[in-house]
Amino acid sequence: FEGLEETVQELDRKQVPVYFTIDLDCLDPSVFPGTGTPEAGGVSFLELLAAIRKVSELNIVGADVNELAPMLDPSGVSTATACKVVRELLLAVAK
C-alpha cells in the first residue's frame, strides 16, 4: 500500500473523522477468489491486516467491507477470509 504511511500521518495531523472502506478485491485471487473483479498480483491477507491496523490509528467513524461474491467461490475460503477481515477491522477500531 504505497503512500499509506504518509496518508495516515496527514489525516492524523488534521484530526479529521475517517470513513474506512475495504474492497476485498484488492486481495490476490490466490487468497480471495470469490470476487467479481479479481486483482492479479493483489495484496496478501497479512498485508491487508497490516494496513487495517495502520488506518485504525485514525479517528474511524464508520467502515464497510465490500466485494465478496460467495457464489464465485464454492470452497468458502473467500467468505472465511471476509469474516476474518471484518473481525480484525472491528478489533482494531475498538481499541
Where are the regions a protein language model picked out?
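Catalytic cores of soluble, metal-dependent hydrolases
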Residues: 1-95
